[in-house]
């Protein structure tokens, strides 16, 4: 199972709380996103996650939109690293106004199996 547990996610949030934006539903964290790789003119959004039973309710769109507006309001360019093979997240980002730029990385890996 590749899902990160709620407790593991909560621990990560607490360690870097100032960089995270969270959404709570019924006093429970249901969605998170983090600003990272911040420079004088750029800021990345990463760690976008909504717990499974709360998906398809607009939480991820709301949180990414909020962080994007925060970054742009602070006169920086907001950007994301995406997996082009993930149509769900890509649709979300494009619906907010993000566009694909040139590929920055090519990953080559070897399995440990």
Model features per residue range: what roles?
Residues 40, 44, 58-67:
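Short amphipathic alpha-helical segments
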Residues 62-77, 99:
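Conserved acyl-CoA
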Residues 32, 101-106:
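Residue-level detector of high-confidence beta-strand sites
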Residues 2-49:
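A conserved beta-strand-loop-helix scaffold within acyl/acetyltransferase catalytic domains
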Residues 61, 85-102:
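Conserved active-site alpha-helix within GNAT-family acetyltransferase domains
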Residues 79-90, 106-113:
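Conserved beta-strand-loop-alpha-helix junction that forms the acyl-donor binding cleft
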Residues 47, 51-62, 85-87:
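Conserved glycine-rich acetyl-CoA-binding loop
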């Amino acid at each position: 199972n590749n899902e990160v547990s709620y407790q593991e996610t909560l621990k990560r949030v607490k360690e870097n709380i100032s960089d995270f934006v969270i959404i709570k539903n019924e006093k429970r964290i249901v969605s998170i996103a983090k600003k990272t790789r911040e420079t004088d003119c750029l800021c990345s959004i990463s760690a976008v996650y909504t717990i499974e039973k709360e998906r398809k309710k607009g939480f991820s769109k709301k949180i990414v939109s909020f962080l994007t507006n925060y970054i742009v309001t602070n006169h920086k360019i907001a950007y994301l690293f995406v997996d082009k093979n993930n149509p769900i997240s890509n649709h979300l980002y494009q619906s907010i106004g993000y566009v694909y730029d040139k590929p920055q990385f090519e990953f080559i890996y070897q399995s440990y199996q």
